[in-house]
Amino acid sequence: MILASCIAVALLPLAASAQVDDAGILIDHVWSGHPVGFNLLTERGHQFIAYYDADRRLTLIGRKLGEAGSTRVQPEGVPVPKRKRTSNTLGWDSHNFLEMALDRDGYLHLSGNMHRDPLVYYRTRQPFDVSTLERVDRMTGELENEVTYPHFFKNERGDLMFRYRDGGSGKGSDYYNIYDERSREWTRLIEGSLLDGEGVRNAYSSGPVRSPDGNYHMVWMWRDTSDAATNHTLSYAYSRDLIHWQTSARKALELPITIKTGEVIDDARPGEGLINMAFNIGFDAESHPIVSYHRYDAEGHSQAYVARPDSRGNWLIRSLSDWDFRWGFSGGGSINGEVRLGSPVLTDEGAMMLNYSTKAAGGGRWYFDSDTLVLLPPPSREPEASESKVALNYAGSNYPGMQSKSVSSTSEEGRWVLRWETLGKNRDHPREVIPPPAELRLYKIF
């Protein structure tokens, strides 16, 4: 394992108090030529922000809450010949989001800027100290040359996990690693992949998501090629320990899970409207899974569906929408989402709630019964979005086409929102005209 130290360490002034005014904290000016996910992590009295600066350089800021000042680092990278850039510099790909996590001992782990690229991974030498960030050239050292969709999360014991896809759209498999703080080494959680495309497809998964009763649930769809229209076969599995998986009817699944072995929620075929940008999972009062997703109806219109299993593994499916438009998508590259569906959420009154937004019909929320999935009237007083105050106080630019983006972080110290602006997705292709940098601001939600 080769370790390389970070460069460009700077101490920056930052508000000492956790009480932030309506204008927020100006963090930096950032790249706005296309959207890509930044990351905000607030945990154990510390806060970390990972983003791409105005020059598209990977940048990390760390601070201790309640103290003045922060530390800003720009870790070094290595050449990525096929991209004609370095691994710490962003190209034009909207897949190249950033992921962070703290392990039990407070060491920060950072990964991202990959779309079928060699693993990009950094780790600090000291707990909570971003100035000690180092590049680590491998995790397990196996199948790490075509990495996409990095994701850190914790299992029920608090072990740090890392999920990623090896390969590409139409030809990829999902792998899971587990971290040992004592040895500072990663190993495979299971032998081989969890979701296996068998060399002719790949899975796009939502999850694993932990339900209130402690189980992990995963929903995915298969895709045959890089063409987004070839998504099909919405599927489901759950596990207590992320190692042994089963269907909703408690039938054990042999690993890896393939298209032949996974439990099917909706057998939608290619071209029938399944899209990996619009599906999620939530839970009712008894921790039963409820899945939200987009597909076309019999007339070819876009609709929002919800589904839930019974004890025998039969899925009840119901449409919540009655739209008369069609979100027609196809081709490769990052596309702009015209339908967004949240995770089904259990309300205090016992109903399920689902937020949605569309380009053609606006947005809103539905309320529905958790057992029958039948629509219910909204309550007399609906909850307000916690970010509404932030939305009113972000002074956006006048540059044509700019969109507001945000990411939030909630911990014992409160809720924070990181907000910036960017142009929309461009199929991962360069633009002829580069817009000016955008403000990156941090807000405390009271």
Model-derived features: positions:
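Bacterial N-terminal signal peptides
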Residues: 4-13
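Sec/Tat signal peptide C-region and signal peptidase I cleavage site
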Residues: 14-18
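Extracellular, repeat-based ectodomains that mediate carbohydrate processing or recognition
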Residues: 19-446
